Amino acid sequence: LNSYRVMDETAKQKKLENGRVLSEVEAEKKIRGFTDHTDYDLIALSGLITTLKWQKKVLNILQKLAPSSYKISGGGLATEFREDLLNWMPDLDGIAHSEGDDVILKIARDAKIIRNSRKMTKSMLTDVVSPEKTTILNGKLYTIYGGGRPKDLNALPFPDWDILTQDPNNKDILENYINTPIWGKEAKNSSATSFSMKRSINTVSSRGCPFACKFCFRGAQGERNYGIRSPENLFCEMKHYVERYGIDFLGYVDDNFAVSRKRIFELEKLISNWTTENGLIWGTHARLDEAADIKNCVDGVLKLNEPLRVNSMYNAGCRYIGFGAESASPRMLE
C-alpha cells in the first residue's frame, strides 16, 4: 500500500514530493480493486513492529472483502512475537516466523487445499498443515509455520521486481516504489542522509547477526543464524538493478552488514571503480564497534584495525550506515 502515493493539496502543503500515504478509506478502495478481480486462496501480510497498526487495519478490511481467504502474517513482526501476535490480530489464520524462502511454498499449498475443501474440521486442518504445528487460542485453531534457511544464499534468484510493473488495475506501482527514497528525510522513517536519491531499490546481503545484544531484535532476517552472500553475487545483483531500473542508490537492509572484514575488502576491490563510473552509491546497517574497528586497548591507548572497514566501504560506494545504539535513557536501561 505504501507504493500507492497520493499527490494532492494535502501532500503539497506538507511538501511531500512523492505524495502522501493512503488513508484507511482509500486503502480499502485500493484493496477492493484486487479482491474484485480475483478470489485469493492466500493473502500474506508482512512487516516489522512498526507495521502492526496498519496490519490490523488491513486485516479488518480483508475480513470484509475476502473472508474465506487463508490469511497469514510473517516477517519480523511475526518472528518477534510468534503466537502472541494472534492476540492482537485474532482474524489471522496463522503466523509464519523466521525465514520464508521454503515455508511460503508450504503455506501456498495448504491455502489451496483449505479453500478447495467445503468443510474443514480441526482434525482435517491439523493433518493438512502437518508437520507444522497448530495452537488453539480463544477456541480458534491457528497454524504456526516455521521457516528455514536455504543452504546457499548465492543460489537464490534475485527478487523479481518486474511483477510490480502492473497491478490488476493496470497501475504501474514499480515506478512509484523506485522513485520513493528508501532512506533520508523524504522517507519519513527516522533515517537521515546528507544526499538525495532519485531512484532506489533495497535488498539484503546477509541474514541475521551473530551477536546477542539484549536491546536489539535481530529476527527480521535470520535471527542469530548469520549467513552472507558473496561479493561476486552482490556485484551481479547491483549491475542488474542499475542496467534494468537505472537506480542511483541501493539499500542493503541487513541486520548487520559489516561482520566480515574479509568480505568488505573483497567487495571494495570488486566494485569500487564500477560504482564510481556508474554513479551508484549504497547504504546499509552495522554496529558501532565495527565502525570503530577497535583491535585492542593497551595501557588506555586504543589500537585500531588497519585498514578500517568503514574506509573500505566508503571506497566501494557506501554513503550511509544506520546504527542501532543502546538507549541513553537510564529509565529505559533499567
Show where each model-derived region lies:
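Glycine-rich beta-alpha loop elements in corrinoid/cobalamin-binding modules
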Residues: 2-153, 157
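Radical SAM [4Fe-4S] cluster-binding motif and immediate context
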Residues: 154-334
